[in-house]
Amino acid sequence: MDNVQEHDPDTQEHNNETQNHKQEDHSNSYQTRTIPFIEPLSREYQKRIILCQTVNGPCPIIALSNALILKSNVDRPFELPKKRYITPDELTEYLVEFAKAYGLCKNQQSLQDKLTSMHFGQQLNPCLYDIEKFEYGHEIFCTFGVRLVHGWILSDDMGLSDEDLSYLRKLEYYEKVADTFAERRSLLEMQEPLTEQQQDFLNNSTCVDKVMENRYTMQFLTNAGLKKILELVGPGEIVVVFRSSHFSTMYSNPDSFAQFTLVTDSGYARTGEDVVWETFDSQTVETGNGELCAANFIPAVYVLNQRKEEKKKRAKDDEQYAKRLAKEEEERGKKETPKKASNTPRRNKSNTQKSRKQSENCLIS
């Protein structure tokens, strides 16, 4: 007789609570995925464990960590353990230990505090005329030797005149432009008459409206900014790019000299090698999104279409093979079928004679 365990409601409830607790823990952790990556020096594919992102907020520390993972080499390795999930505290500890091992920071407590805050975002104030210049917020990337760039560079292709560009250059940083925009809104909404100075301010700062109204439409990336990134990020280099309040790990493919950002959306974590990169080019400027690519930088749509065609071909081949087997089985069955026996039963001679004798003995004379 099989052993039957009695159902215990308290135990079941405890198991459910434990399971829910584990799920809750995972929801606060970073999922990992393994991707093949062409190591720039050896030019060979290597397996790298990277971090994925589920919610908004931790993209700065994820981009920084993934950049270190892709930059990892025998002289300065940085690898994540083979775990499906990494907690924020674990990631902070890995980064602090890495910095400690290579003498990247003297004040470890200060570094740990900065890294901890990066799980919730990172404030930056980019310069509108230099892709590598920030007023603040870039220091942590400098500590780990990871270049930080952005593509929000102002130019005449935004409909700005030379006078506009000259005025904006004096503001220099994005936050100063945003403050000027807010001041303009406030003056335009005033009911009382403006002073001559206030009116001059409004007349001279109209260009600010163009910049601020287009910032989300253009996703904080301009053609001038893209051109600068292509010029200054060398082949095989790995950097972090800041765009539209988001941080991404960027790789410059040494074979094509094209730029790609690492896809870290957890929704693609189980796509294997099919979706690993996203192009960073003029399409990104025009639409805000690049084209998804496989690990070998071939557009994912081609890879998926090819796989669909291969699947259809396999299904068709399997169907033809099944039909051929069925036909062979049918022909074999026809050859092995025995001749049909006669339906008329054979008469037993001895029994017939015996019956005749019995009949003769029963005759009545």
Curated annotation (Swiss-Prot):
To yeast YGL082w. Residues 340-353 have a biased composition (Polar residues). Keywords: Cytoplasm. One of its GO terms (molecular function) is cysteine-type deubiquitinase activity. It is found in: Cytoplasm. Residues 1-27, 315-339 have a biased composition (Basic and acidic residues). Transmembrane segments: none annotated. This is Uncharacterized protein C12G12.11c. PANTHER family: NF-E2 INDUCIBLE PROTEIN, UBIQUITIN CARBOXYL-TERMINAL HYDROLASE. Signal peptide: none annotated. Interacts with sad1. The keyword Transmembrane helix does not apply. Residues 1-31, 308-365 are annotated as: Disordered. InterPro entries: MINDY (IPR007518), MINDY_domain (IPR033979). The keyword Disulfide bond does not apply. It holds the Pfam family MINDY_DUB. It comes from the Eukaryota. GO terms for cellular component: cytosol; nucleus.
